[in-house]
Regions:
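RNA pseudouridine synthases
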Residues: 1-155
Length: 155
C-alpha cells in the first residue's frame, strides 16, 4: 500500500474522489502508459489537501499499482502532475525542475511477523519550498489534514 503527495495543474472541484480507468502501454509512444479500454484495471483514490487556483495539492492512493498510474490518471482527467512533461504538464511552479510527485508512505504486512509495517518519507525540501511559495503567492484553501486523510472511507 502506497500513498503519494502530488501537485497537479488546475483546480479539482471535488475534495475527494476515485479515478477508475484501465491502463496499458501506449502503442505509439512505447515509453509511456495510457488509459485504454483494453488495459488492466487501475484505481486511484485522491483527497485534496490545498487549492491554489491554478494548482491543487493532493494525496493519492493507487490501489492497483500500475506503472505511472497516478501520472496517467491525472493527466487523463486534464490535471497533469506539475512538472511532468512526459504526461502533458506545461506548468512548473517557482522554477521547480522536476515533477511534483512524492511517495510519502509505504505499508505492508511483514512476511516474518504478519504485523503491519509502515514507512513514512517527509516531503523533500524543494517540494516543500514550492508549497511555501504557492502559499505566499496566493491564499491556499486547505481541505483536509493528514490525519483526516488516513481515516477516510476506502483508504
Amino acid at each position: 500500500e502506497k500513498r503519494y503527495l502530488a501537485l497537479v495543474e488546475g483546480s479539482i472541484s471535488d475534495d475527494r474522489g476515485l479515478i477508475d480507468l484501465p491502463i496499458e502501454r501506449d502503442p505509439v509512444r512505447r515509453q509511456q502508459m495510457a488509459v485504454r479500454l483494453e488495459g488492466k484495471p487501475a484505481r486511484s483514490y485522491f483527497e485534496v489537501l490545498e487549492q491554489f487556483g491554478d494548482f491543487t495539492y493532493l494525496q493519492a492512493k493507487p490501489v492497483s499499482g500500475r506503472t505511472h498510474q497516478i501520472r496517467v490518471h491525472f493527466s487523463f482527467i486534464r490535471h497533469p502532475v506539475a512538472g511532468d512533461r512526459l504526461y502533458g504538464s506545461t506548468k512548473s511552479p517557482n522554477g521547480l525542475g522536476r515533477q511534483f510527485l512524492h511517495a510519502t508512505e509505504l505499508a505492508f504486512d511483514s512476511p516474518l511477523t504478519g504485523r503491519r509495517v509502515t514507512f513514512h518519507s517527509p516531503l523533500p525540501g524543494d517540494l516543500e519550498s514550492c508549497l511555501i511559495w504557492l502559499r505566499k503567492r496566493k491564499g491556499a484553501r486547505q481541505s483536509r489534514t493528514s490525519e483526516q486523510l488516513r481515516t477516510c472511507e476506502g483508504w
